[in-house]
């Protein structure tokens, strides 16, 4: 039954929930066991149901189940994105991207069935004791993502265009923070940053859109899966993925550290306030700031932009998170971080 399920033709993206099999019927027909994980409560709340082999105990399929109308739109967006990315990405990239197997109905909404990717989430190793304090382990994480992004971007590169890190960010920020009295000055600084970046060109490539370490799966130091493609595009600004990974990696360096204490493995970094790890990465001294900057510099040069624009790209990436994240508090914290970094860098 499992092999039959894996070789079925996916239901048309236009099929309405009432035209689909129920999740329960699909799960029973697959011969697999169900395991519910990843329940969230935000506006795009989804439940992930893993269908596990009763023989090997390994996940075979994953079902993205929306619990709100907003989440339903996000699930459908990811389904379309996964189908689209497989049309343009090279084999090495496609091999680590979930494949849409089918769509099912759950409580009147469309849920997407995809292949489960092997490996351990990078987030699991990230939170292990001493992992982010150990230069070799952190470098291996960055190297794995650099290798994969190189394959994705070189394999999907199209026409070149001016670097565009805005993509509606400024407009979204204005909607999100309408009562902020300092907002116009902040937007002026963001415009200056984007103007400097826009003097350069990069190829339009496939973009994941949420390239943080929680969406990367590993076997050793090799990437075996990249998940959560709902924010992706087949033709976008590749610098977005580059800076998103580096920024999110830096953001949580002090997660185990008590307030005001030194962060283990990173001389010069203290857990003094939210975002201290990012400030350290951009303006600090040490092996992690060096690794962070070199990762961005190499990526920018590979894409045809000057290495010297790494800081502008990173700060623009912080503004992007403030604009696009679903969590308003997370957005506000990023916006305040953007302000501090602009002051520090005299943007």
Q: What do the PLM-derived regions correspond to, one by one?
A:
Residues 19-35, 157-208:
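An alpha-helical support segment within catalytic cores of ATP-dependent transferases
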Residues 240-300, 317-329:
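Active-site activation/catalytic loop segments of kinase-like enzymes and analogous catalytic loops
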Residues 97-110:
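Short beta-strand micro-motifs within the conserved protein kinase catalytic domain, predominantly
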Residues 38, 42, 46-52, 56-58, ...:
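Active-site acidic catalytic loop and adjacent metal/ATP-binding pocket
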Residues 108-121:
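Conserved short submotifs of the Hanks-type protein kinase catalytic core
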Residues 45-78, 134:
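ATP-binding glycine-rich loop module of kinase domains
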Residues 81-92, 96, 120-163, 187-201, ...:
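Conserved kinase catalytic-core helix
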Residues 1-39, 313, 319-347:
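Regulatory N- and C-terminal appendages and interdomain linkers associated
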